[in-house]
């Protein structure tokens, strides 16, 4: 059954719309970073020297820059296409993109855009900001941080909309 379904004519092609964003980010960060401090002390009850470890929080700061090229955000509302499935489709190979031609859609299903440019850009910026937090933590001298503050700037913002191909195969499992 599965072997028979693997024939290429059982795959159904369709196009999913995406917004692709390219931008450069630069941000300054500041956070309290945990440092382990080991101390020796004299325990008068046992009349011996002992060692204890404590956490000392120190302020650190830094700056990070990163370039994003073709950062994809789905143009399909999450209610229509499961985000978990969608996440497993990404990344696409973007090296062979071609300019849109309506003839490419002849005989192939394509979803229309549900997500407009402003909402897609807001999603991209939110996701990039989450990644920036991880970049800031990685830039710190220890991954245990608190009170993280980020001041981020975007530059060279560009966008385009894409139809990316997906193939679906359905088979019945017995």
Predicted regions and their residues:
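Charged, low-complexity helical/coil segments in non-catalytic cytosolic or luminal regions
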Residues: 1-173
